[in-house]
Amino acid sequence: MLAAALAALMIAACGGDDDSGPTGDVRANGTDAAFTNAMIPHHESAVDAADLALSRAEHGQLEELAREMLTVQSTELATLRSVRDVIQQAGIEQGDLGLSEEEMGVGHDPAELRNAQDFDCAFIEMMVPHHEGAIRMARAELESGIHAELRRMSENIIDAQGYEIRQMRRFDRRWCDGRAAGGHSESDAGHSG
């Protein structure tokens, strides 16, 4: 399904270039280091929430979306950890993405979903801004990062999570009367151009 296609795309997009120069120097900068260090815990929390959705979701469509999130973000996590290790071994100092924690969507605790009365709406309310934060982080990487693999991943994050935001907003209108994902910017739902 979509999860398999997205996973195949991620594997294909993340393979190939080793981002080393002719002397074996790592082609990365402080933005790349900041991106990996911020995106790893960001993805970990999304994976935790999606994993919880597999057992708590009331609607099969949300469970399917959560399964897709798990597949794609688990693959991305493996790549992020590998690239982070290479960047750290190269001694590249961490820069700054230029985003606040709120802008990165990191103020959400998946543990809060465990006891949510209306799980599906609570999941949507948490994950839409969380995904918007991932898109902002990916755009910051594209703007200033130089690591080719991370730049490809950022493009994929923008596309995949933009799609997922649109799906969750549709679910929100159907199941939550538009209250769960309301007030969030459409411009953060994927590519703007």
Where do the PLM segments sit?
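C-terminal motif of bacterial Sec signal peptides marking the signal peptidase cleavage site
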Residues: M10-A13
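All-alpha RGS (Regulator of G-protein Signaling) helical domain and cognate RGS-like helical scaffolds
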Residues: G15-G193
